[in-house]
C-alpha cells in the first residue's frame, strides 16, 4: 500500500492532482478541504494517501491531515459508501463539522451534501457514532461549541428529558453559546414544543 507521497505538485484540477515523485507522476484525488490548502504548483507537497485497488483501477486518495485520512477510512467501512461518496462528504464539510453532525445526530446537515439522502445520512450517523476519535474528543477543545452541546445535553438529561428531546432542543442553540445560556435556550425551546 502507498501510505504517503512527497514530491512536486505538477497539476491541480479539482479534485485531481498530479504529483511528481522522482520522475514518476502520481494522479491523486483529494477532498476540496485538502485542495484549498495545497501549495502552488511547482512547490513541494506531502500527502497522506489511501490506495484503493479495484479490478479495473488502482486509485490514490490524498489528505493533508491524519484526521482526514482516518475519517475517510471510517466512511469507507460503511455499507453503501464508496470512495467517491466519502470524498464528497469530506469535500462538503470539515472533519470537525462531520463530527459535530454525528454528535448532534443532525441528519438534515448531512442531506445537504450532494448524493446523500435521508437514509444514507441516518446510516452515516448510526455507524459513525463514537468512531471519529470519540467524535473528535467532542471537538477537541475545552470551550468548543460541541463541548457546550454535550454539557447542555447532560443537563437536560439530568432534568428528565429524553436524549431525543435534548438533541432536538440543542439544535436551537447557536454555536458558541455558553453552557448556562445554552441550557436556558434549550429549556425555552422544549417549553414551546
From Swiss-Prot:
Has three domains with a flexible linker between the domains II and III and assumes an 'L' shape. Domain III is highly mobile and contacts RuvB. It comes from Burkholderia cenocepacia (strain ATCC BAA-245 / DSM 16553 / LMG 16656 / NCTC 13227 / J2315 / CF5610) (Burkholderia cepacia (strain J2315)). One of its GO terms (molecular function) is four-way junction helicase activity. This is Holliday junction branch migration complex subunit RuvA. Residues 139-143 are annotated as: Flexible linker. GO terms for cellular component: cytoplasm; Holliday junction helicase complex; Holliday junction resolvase complex. Homotetramer. Forms an RuvA(8)-RuvB(12)-Holliday junction (HJ) complex. HJ DNA is sandwiched between 2 RuvA tetramers; dsDNA enters through RuvA and exits via RuvB. An RuvB hexamer assembles on each DNA strand where it exits the tetramer. Each RuvB hexamer is contacted by two RuvA subunits (via domain III) on 2 adjacent RuvB subunits; this complex drives branch migration. In the full resolvosome a probable DNA-RuvA(4)-RuvB(12)-RuvC(2) complex forms which resolves the HJ. SMART domains: HhH1. Residues 65-139 are annotated as: Domain II. CDD domains: UBA_RuvA_C. The gene is ruvA.
Amino acid at each position: 500500500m502507498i501510505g504517503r507521497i512527497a514530491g512536486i505538485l505538477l497539476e491541480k484540477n479539482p479534485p485531481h492532482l498530479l504529483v511528481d515523485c522522482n520522475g514518476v507522476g502520481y494522479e491523486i484525488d483529494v477532498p476540496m478541504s485538502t485542495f484549498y490548502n495545497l501549495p502552488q504548483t511547482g512547490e513541494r507537497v506531502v500527502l497522506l494517501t489511501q490506495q484503493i485497488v479495484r479490478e479495473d483501477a488502482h486509485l490514490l486518495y490524498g489528505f493533508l491531515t491524519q484526521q482526514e485520512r482516518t475519517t475517510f477510512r471510517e466512511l469507507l467501512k460503511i455499507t453503501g459508501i464508496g470512495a467517491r461518496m466519502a470524498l464528497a462528504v469530506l469535500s462538503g464539510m470539515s472533519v470537525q463539522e462531520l463530527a459535530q453532525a454525528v454528535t448532534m445526530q443532525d441528519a438534515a446537515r448531512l442531506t445537504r451534501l450532494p448524493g446523500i439522502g435521508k437514509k444514507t445520512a441516518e446510516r452515516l450517523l448510526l455507524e459513525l457514532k463514537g468512531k471519529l476519535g470519540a467524535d473528535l474528543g467532542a471537538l477537541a477543545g475545552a470551550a468548543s461549541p460541541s463541548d457546550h452541546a454535550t454539557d447542555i445535553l447532560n443537563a437536560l438529561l439530568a432534568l428528565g428529558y429524553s436524549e431525543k428531546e435534548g438533541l432536538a432542543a440543542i439544535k436551537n442553540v447557536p454555536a458558541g453559546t455558553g453552557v448556562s445560556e445554552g441550557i436556558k435556550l434549550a429549556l425555552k425551546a422544549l417549553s414551546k414544543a
